[in-house]
Amino acid sequence: MPLSYQHFRKLLLLDDGTEAGPLEEELPRLADADLNRRVAEDLNLGNLNVSIPWTHKVGNFTGLYSSTVPIFNPEWQTPSFPKIHLQEDIINRCQQFVGPLTVNEKRRLKLIMPARFYPTHTKYLPLDKGIKPYYPDQVVNHYFQTRHYLHTLWKAGILYKRETTRSASFCGSPYSWEQELQHSQRHGDESFCSQPSGIPSRSSVGPCIRSQLNKSRLGLQPHQGPLASSQPGRSGSIRARAHPSTRRYFGVEPSGSGHIDHSVNNSSSCLHQSAVRKAAYSHLSTSKRQSSSGHAVEFHCLAPSSAGSQSQGSVSSCWWLQFRNSKPCSEYCLSHLVNLREDWGPCDDHGEHHIRIPRTPARVTGGVFLVDKNPHNTAESRLVVDFSQFSRGITRVSWPKFAVPNLQSLTNLLSSNLSWLSLDVSAAFYHIPLHPAAMPHLLIGSSGLSRYVARLSSNSRINNNQYGTMQNLHDSCSRQLFVSLMLLYKTYGWKLHLYSHPIVLGFRKIPMGVGLSPFLLAQFTSAICSVVRRAFPHCLAFSYMDDVVLGAKSVQHRESLYTAVTNFLLSLGIHLNPNKTKRWGYSLNFMGYIIGSWGTLPQDHIVQKIKHCFRKLPVNRPIDWKVCQRIVGLLGFAAPFTQCGYPALMPLYACIQAKQAFTFSPTYKAFLSKQYMNLYPVARQRPGLCQVFADATPTGWGLAIGHQRMRGTFVAPLPIHTAELLAACFARSRSGAKLIGTDNSVVLSRKYTSFPWLLGCTANWILRGTSFVYVPSALNPADDPSRGRLGLSRPLLRLPFQPTTGRTSLYAVSPSVPSHLPVRVHFASPLHVAWRPP
């Protein structure tokens, strides 16, 4: 007969009123391999091979990799981005505020001014892959919403726009490391020429032709080239070679189609620029053809913005405007839409500043698509950037590691009687500037509407030689496209034309979706909080990623602190969202926890999720191990607040490791659900003096409680770690002390997942809330009793205990970077790696 739930609780000594014998007899039984095996069989924990089909869904949990079907919202609003410009002299400003910075703070702030990203390999994808066809039924809507989002980011100074192979434009205030083209005159031939009078500054290519001519005639000196920097010594930071003058320049705008055209296209020049250009073309088309294996240069027209100035020349190259002169092919022909307005605005948009960049191809390195901003806000969209190539395969980059505060450290740090508020940093990632040299690696964009629609519609063929014909122009006309564009015209107006052109954008601020970004953000906010803490030593400021919290003794004090800190952050160029400032009172909500003076508990929404999970959890049905991963993820978060902690979940971990289905028996489910229905806070550790010590040998245990000594023997020899754990449990139950000295590192770590399962669960409950102090064996007063010698009494140790705040120390004082240590020697661990069903 399977083990009943009541018997199981009694076995684990979880019920107070059990008629069990003394702990010294009962606990060692739980370490018995035979008992653990019988219990595992009774609870069906060891039976991993099942023939019944697996269950792939439990409540909201599906397998880890089965994606939920995303829902497209045609009404999505593109969020607005403030003009974020982090001050370049951030270190000086912090020093004015708080005095000299520590080594650590300086190092962290230098890391992000500017951030650098140089992967060894980068895979370039065609522009067609720029916008992912994530919503097959809403292709056109998704295309324009995404293009509008990208345009918004570019206008806010978050993206660069690739103008030519070696130049980019952006909006917003420039940084010193962004070399403006106009200002590089000092290097003579090396510079891109500044704008000649009479040619609007909109044109990215026209003004630069003469300097191109000079280059191709004179050849480049080795130290010059499109990358030589305007300041000596700066060129090294760009990390790219100066290329000979035979470099091919392709604009982003392919003539009329998405393919790159290797011929000089005179007809595409705007009329008032054609004179300048023809002179240039006659030279370029010959010299470049000979020097670069038949590839000519293509210059594209960028129509000026003035109304009605679209000349015939520009129309012929623009897919959108070609419809104006063509005969409608049907009632759903796009020419009906294009003829709705006279002025469709420019084909292209240019930023306030033009800078030089390393050679950047008209390609992308990652795709983008839109999703809901978050589960609670489905009205706004969020851009997802997929740079997963940098996390896998040959292009993999190993990201730097950083400390995440653990629960106990967080509680020690924040569990206090302070009054709290949390600040919301708007678009935190987009505060940190990225060096332009990283642009070629982080490219996003789109191949233009014609190409995008052609790729997705079955009837059109993308053949380079067909794009000239009118018939081919109308291949993309369809009822669905026409209806979609008419609806979008109401929203975007003339911008439909702008967005239908191809574009390549690079990141000017760090993107989400690259493993470097969370690391840099964590470094940045922790350095800022460190500065704030030193400026206001009687208060507490703490951050994790973009979540910044401030604590002060009283509400009035907190409000004045809030004003001072907000003004300081604004002076650095950090944008706060005042509407989202939350005042928590004396219990802080942070990182999914509620932290008060009594300790820490999980937030209510997580508790509700757990209750829902147990309601939906099927009994006696094998559950797919991927679903188990989701269940363990949720339960693992709240495990430290339960009686038995992580050890209770070990059977689940074992099945995930074996990639086998797991079957919940009624008893095991009842045991877990009871564990999670009563959550106990994790309390703050207090400093104190340790006066209780435990030690063990494989055959016996010994305790030193004050001046009192105790010893005992085990019925059978036990593994040393198990014996030490039992001794610690006896010390806690005999003395009630919350501070115990031990010389065993495994007990000290308080990770009991590697012990026999029943013992691990019970020990976790007995030792919950206990702090351990390391005492070397030679000084351990319990060492002699454990060896059976009570006569020799060593002098009583008074070991001080100081609670740790882990790597998240309050003051950012850290040693300088250590020199490279030799490779460590790994010894085989005497512990089992994980719990396995016997």
Swiss-Prot record:
Describe activation and inhibition of this protein. Answer: Activated by host HSP70 and HSP40 in vitro to be able to bind the epsilon loop of the pgRNA. Because deletion of the RNase H region renders the protein partly chaperone-independent, the chaperones may be needed indirectly to relieve occlusion of the RNA-binding site by this domain. Inhibited by several reverse-transcriptase inhibitors: Lamivudine, Adefovir and Entecavir.
Mind telling me which Gene3D superfamilies this protein's record contains?
Answer: 3.30.70.270
* Catalytic reaction list: DNA(n) + a 2'-deoxyribonucleoside 5'-triphosphate = DNA(n+1) + diphosphate; Endonucleolytic cleavage to 5'-phosphomonoester
User: Does Nuclease show up as a keyword for this record?
Assistant: yes
Q: Additional info?
A: Hepadnaviral virions contain probably just one P protein molecule per particle.
Annotated family = Belongs to the hepadnaviridae P protein family.
Q: What is this protein called?
A: Protein P
**Organism annotation:** Hepatitis B virus genotype A2 subtype adw (isolate Japan/Nishioka/1983) (HBV-A)
- Anything noted about its domains? Terminal protein domain (TP) is hepadnavirus-specific. Spacer domain is highly variable and separates the TP and RT domains. Polymerase/reverse-transcriptase domain (RT) and ribonuclease H domain (RH) are similar to retrovirus reverse transcriptase/RNase H. The polymerase/reverse transcriptase (RT) and ribonuclease H (RH) domains are structured in five subdomains: finger, palm, thumb, connection and RNase H. Within the palm subdomain, the 'primer grip' region is thought to be involved in the positioning of the primer terminus for accommodating the incoming nucleotide. The RH domain stabilizes the association of RT with primer-template.
Terminal protein domain (TP): region residues: 1-179
Enumerate the UniProt keywords alphabetically. DNA replication, DNA-binding, DNA-directed DNA polymerase, Endonuclease, Host-virus interaction, Hydrolase, Inhibition of host innate immune response by virus, Inhibition of host RLR pathway by virus, Magnesium, Metal-binding, Multifunctional enzyme, Nuclease, Nucleotidyltransferase, RNA-directed DNA polymerase, Transferase, Viral immunoevasion
* HAMAP family listed in its UniProt record: HBV_DPOL
One GO term in the molecular function aspect is: DNA-directed DNA polymerase activity
What PANTHER family does this protein's entry cite?
Answer: PEPTIDASE A2 DOMAIN-CONTAINING PROTEIN-RELATED, POL PROTEIN
**Positions annotated to bind Mg(2+):** D424, D546, D547
- InterPro entries referenced in this protein's UniProt entry, alphabetically: DNA/RNA_pol_sf, DNApol_viral_C, DNApol_viral_N, HBV_DPOL, Rev_trsase/Diguanyl_cyclase, RT_dom, Viral_Replic_Matur_Polypro
What is known about what this protein does? Answer: Multifunctional enzyme that converts the viral RNA genome into dsDNA in viral cytoplasmic capsids. This enzyme displays a DNA polymerase activity that can copy either DNA or RNA templates, and a ribonuclease H (RNase H) activity that cleaves the RNA strand of RNA-DNA heteroduplexes in a partially processive 3'- to 5'-endonucleasic mode. Neo-synthesized pregenomic RNA (pgRNA) are encapsidated together with the P protein, and reverse-transcribed inside the nucleocapsid.
Pfam annotation, one family = RVT_1
* Start and end residues of each Reverse transcriptase domain: 352-595
Q: Where is this site: Priming of reverse-transcription by covalently linking the first nucleotide of the (-)DNA?
A: Y65
